[in-house]
């Protein structure tokens, strides 16, 4: 995660990469660039506590039980639970959480449509858990740059040109290949 200050807005910005999430109560901005990945921007509108995650794959298909929980930064099932838990620990109330979904583009046309699986997972998770989606910009063939202001709930989305697709696709392929080589570790509370 990279921290910087945007001089134009005078706001602290956190740039998250695949497998990361960030939660804040402060007047900060969280940003990321998405291809087939999904980001959920989630907040409690009463407390202003909000956060964003960025995940590459829907679920860890190798996990068969609590002893095999994977690193929370790899898969959507753990990324969503960890984001929600961090929001609750920061003072958000579960029944007030609002979800905004972004990404899931098909930017790698020669491979499996990972974005489609990510979108399906995100919808299943949100509806199964009883949360509500208040906004979305998902699917299609475009990568996206997301700027999220958790205090206000405002999101700015820029659809990027196709020329960004090749570098983003290469980055996503490297990330997918590295996931399987990392040891299973981490702790997550599934509720």
Swiss-Prot record:
UniProt keywords, alphabetically: Chemotaxis, Hydrolase
GO molecular function, one term: protein-glutamine glutaminase activity
GO biological process: chemotaxis
Reactions it catalyzes: L-glutaminyl-[protein] + H2O = L-glutamyl-[protein] + NH4(+)
Pfam families registered for this protein in UniProt: CheD
EC number: 3.5.1.44
Coiled coil feature spans: none
CDD domains hit by this protein: CheD
Homology family: Belongs to the CheD family.
Role, per record: Probably deamidates glutamine residues to glutamate on methyl-accepting chemotaxis receptors (MCPs), playing an important role in chemotaxis.
Name of this protein: Probable chemoreceptor glutamine deamidase CheD
């Amino acid at each position: 995660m990279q921290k910087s200050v945007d001089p134009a807005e005078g706001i602290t910005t956190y740039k998250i990469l695949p497998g990361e999430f960030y939660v804040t109560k402060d007047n900060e901005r969280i940003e990321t660039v998405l291809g087939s990945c999904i980001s959920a921007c989630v907040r409690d509108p009463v407390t202003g506590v909000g956060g964003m995650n960025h995940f590459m794959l829907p679920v860890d298909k190798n996990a068969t039980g609590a002893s095999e929980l994977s690193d929370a930064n790899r898969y959507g099932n753990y990324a969503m639970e960890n984001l929600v838990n961090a929001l609750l620990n920061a003072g958000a109330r579960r029944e007030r959480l609002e979800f905004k979904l972004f990404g899931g583009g098909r930017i790698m046309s020669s491979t499996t449509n990972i974005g489609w699986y990510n979108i399906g997972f995100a919808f299943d998770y949100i509806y199964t858990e009883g949360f509500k989606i208040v906004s979305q910009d998902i699917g299609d063939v475009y990568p996206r740059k997301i700027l999220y202001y958790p205090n206000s709930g405002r999101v700015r989305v820029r659809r990027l040109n196709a020329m960004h697709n090749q570098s983003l696709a290469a980055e996503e392929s490297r990330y997918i290949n590295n996931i399987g080589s990392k040891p299973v570790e981490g702790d997550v509370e599934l509720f």
